[in-house]
Amino acid sequence: MAKIYFTLTGTRHYYGSDFLKSGMKIQLEKEPDNKYDPEAIQVKLKGMGKIGYVANSPYTMIGESMSARRIYDKIDDQANAKVVMVTPNGTLCKLSKKSLVSYTE
């Protein structure tokens, strides 16, 4: 299976992105009660809580990263990921293969 990349967005509403570094482990958690987007996936960092969301708009996504809508059914309620690269336009992250619903060893 191909690697799944996504863009972490909205960090300016929480802690900013200056603390984010390549290789950092992050957690994804579905937020079905989100009043703006029923397929919202929040991004959390241990010890800090919510730091942003998986981008769901082509305007906030970097390159060929997947939207929250495309990832939503590929994961359970929670998933693991890592930061790949921090840019001025957003943070590129990679979903852990083991977090995929279809994952088998």
What is each model feature region?
Residues M1-E105:
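Conserved active-site motif detector
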